Amino acid sequence: MDTVGQYLMENPEEALRLDVKTDPGAVRSQALLCGIGPGARVLDGGCGSGKTTAVLCEMVQPGGSAVGVDFAEDRVRFAKKTYGDTPGIEFALMDLRSPLNALGSFDFVWIRFVLEYYLEGAREMVENVSRVLKPGGRICLLDLDYNCLNHYPIEPAMESVIHALVRRMMEKYNFDPYAGRKLYTHLYDLGFDDIEVHLVPHHLIYGELKESDDFNWFKKLEMASSKARDVFDGYPGGYETFRKDFRQVFNHPRRFTYSPLIIVTGRKPS
């Protein structure tokens, strides 16, 4: 079976996971770094639950608007139900790999935590979405580097399984744990001007574990492990023991986990 075109995290609770994990304050800070402000028309590509679209829409008031697009009917339905009454917002069922001209043109195109699911095809997606960006408009790419890989302290056997699981997701499900480091080069190669790069922490987990982080990380583990259960065969006790051991480590306030977020923005030539 060809799994490269499948979304790694696809499951009935994905809209909820995305909604729970999205921090409006972090979105605002990141959008300010990209220059998003009042009066702009913004495309939120891969909008998921619509929560980020709603934050962006709030930031472009007065006079602005935001359009969120996603290829999953259930997520667009969730977004419309939860955030569709926000003035200036709309949601559409569309694939970022397909023509987007029907949406019109935008001052900003925002692509956050999408390219990590496109080890193959990320650059082509960026090129496609840039076609609806106005001349002089800015594209905003935001993604993680070393995604899910940085935990301390952790036993070598557990770390080995995590790395093997991530490799399997790369090989079979088009996942890219190093998407962040590639964003600048995407824009450079596509001829964008005035490229700016910012590096900030995203996952920065220490001390007591937040309920939202617990839900997000164990939903990730559940989804990835369901696609590669054999990866756990070499771990003493198999998957169930690994899950129990990882929960014990991850819930301990001594644990330190982080993932860097790379933000790259560039101006489309006039």
Task: Give the role of each language-model region.
Residues 2-25:
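Class I SAM-dependent methyltransferase Rossmann-like catalytic core
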Residues 4, 13-14, 198-255:
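C-terminal helical/coil "lid" or tail adjacent to the Rossmann-like core of SAM-dependent
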Residues 21-38, 55:
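Conserved alpha-helix/loop element of class I SAM-dependent methyltransferases that forms part
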Residues 43-45, 49-99, 124:
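Class I SAM-dependent methyltransferase SAM/SAH-binding core
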Residues 61, 118-119, 133-135:
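Helix-to-beta-strand junctions that scaffold the AdoMet/dcAdoMet cofactor pocket
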Residues 100-109:
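A short acidic, Gly/Pro-enriched loop at the edge of an enzyme's catalytic core
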Residues 123-138:
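A short glycine-rich, Lys/Arg-flanked "PGG" loop and its adjoining helix->strand segment in the class I
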Residues 140-209:
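Conserved catalytic/acceptor-binding region of the Class I
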